[in-house]
Amino acid sequence: MVTSSFPISVAVFALITLQVGTQDSFIAAVYEHAVILPNKTETPVSQEDALNLMNENIDILETAIKQAAEQGARIIVTPEDALYGWKFTRETVFPYLEDIPDPQVNWIPCQDPHRFGHTPVQARLSCLAKDNSIYVLANLGDKKPCNSRDSTCPPNGYFQYNTNVVYNTEGKLVARYHKYHLYSEPQFNVPEKPELVTFNTAFGRFGIFTCFDIFFYDPGVTLVKDFHVDTILFPTAWMNVLPLLTAIEFHSAWAMGMGVNLLVANTHHVSLNMTGSGIYAPNGPKVYHYDMKTELGKLLLSEVDSHPLSSLAYPTAVNWNAYATTIKPFPVQKNTFRGFISRDGFNFTELFENAGNLTVCQKELCCHLSYRMLQKEENEVYVLGAFTGLHGRRRREYWQVCTLLKCKTTNLTTCGRPVETASTRFEMFSLSGTFGTEYVFPEVLLTEIHLSPGKFEVLKDGRLVNKNGSSGPILTVSLFGRWYTKDSLYSSCGTSNSAITYLLIFILLMIIALQNIVML
């Protein structure tokens, strides 16, 4: 179990600060929730049984919300799928859904629970926010009736959406977000387009998206670049994948790369590798939690800056390829070999010596590493790897990755496979790459899945370097680039109304064109 602590003195300080009207910082909370799951069934349960299960989960969330408020938290994020779990069909999830209105309707469900039909879950969540004077983000399912004569309307007459809601300190619904990038969620529909949802508070502007959304330009990058949000609220049901995509590793890197606060609440389910929540700032993690040993939930709190981009403590813009494109490449090793991380083919070269300078390239991406180990463990092998291309089985997202990583064994065929422990410490490392994208996320992961706050930094010229001498034993040091403009076209793992419409139009036009050719 990995947990960084939250000192009570911070809560006291924040309360005093708020009393004198300062809004430069606030206390945030996230809760990692071990979801009480429904019994496995292929037939829908009754609406009453669905509500009973959701209330069991809300009972647990209520305790966390009250504890967070008592410690001075102004806002709390709870996880994706926290009320009922994740394994459903369209039919079996339906009893759990409510009609969630647009926040423009000016609604406090706690005071008017029947205004939009049967909405007991929304009413209870609203009351929890109101009674504890805290902003609450929760994830639940939204259902929207549609006209059966509309070709995009599903057979049951409803669009169904994976949805985040936010209630303010008065219990008012202030934000609603429908997840766009679904991941193996046949129970839900894909919205017509990515929604760009923000809301303002006395302690900053907030944006919202969910889980798999974080890998794409919309909505996340647009919220930061065009809507200038200070903090992202991020509920997720994240399954950890070593070596590059553990929750705490990638989420802390995203916050640093984008220059915003990221409040992450993950579900907790060890058998599915679901754990890893945190409160991340642009200069590193404030608090995080990773626990693969217990089935317990965890409340995390930390003070964060309300407007991190305006703080002098945070770095200025990085030119990610400035250093790598101006230096003379280090000697490219003759023994470069091919290996895989998940399904992605990397070019690797081994770190044979205790210290050195290495370059490994793949197509247009060259990765440069300077390093010095304190002592090279004989039973551990490290490699420098490069990958540029469309990622994974779906081949949707274009990645550019430079990574220093420990191989699972001394057999080079195991390089890129998951490994959780290491003994080798590095006195110095400097990693850079000839990235074609400005969106690069710096990752450092230590033995037993620890982060390394305050032990590394990104220089303005794009180098990821260690600070203050040696680090803990290293699992990975990576620069994870996303080249969004090279992504392939796709539809998410749900039902996209617009995608179906465009496909039908395209087929119709092709038929007309062929008919015209035949007539000629």
From Swiss-Prot:
One of its GO terms (cellular component) is extracellular region. It holds the Pfam family CN_hydrolase. Glycans are attached at N39, N273, N347, N357, N411, N468. Widely expressed with higher expression in spleen and blood. Its EC number is 3.5.1.92. The keyword Glycosyltransferase does not apply. The active site is at E80 (proton acceptor), K179 (proton donor), C211 (nucleophile). GO terms for biological process: pantothenate metabolic process. InterPro entries: Biotinidase-like_euk, Biotinidase/VNN, C-N_Hydrolase, C-N_Hydrolase_sf, Vanin_C. It is found in: Cell membrane. It catalyses: (R)-pantetheine + H2O = cysteamine + (R)-pantothenate. CDD domains: biotinidase_like. Residues 31-306 form the CN hydrolase domain. GO terms for molecular function: pantetheine hydrolase activity. Amidohydrolase that hydrolyzes specifically one of the carboamide linkages in D-pantetheine thus recycling pantothenic acid (vitamin B5) and releasing cysteamine. Involved in the thymus homing of bone marrow cells. May regulate beta-2 integrin-mediated cell adhesion, migration and motility of neutrophil. PANTHER family: BIOTINIDASE-RELATED, PANTETHEINE HYDROLASE VNN2. Belongs to the carbon-nitrogen hydrolase superfamily. BTD/VNN family. This is Pantetheine hydrolase VNN2. It comes from Homo sapiens (Human). The lineage of its organism: Eukaryota, Metazoa, Chordata, Craniata, Vertebrata. The gene is VNN2.
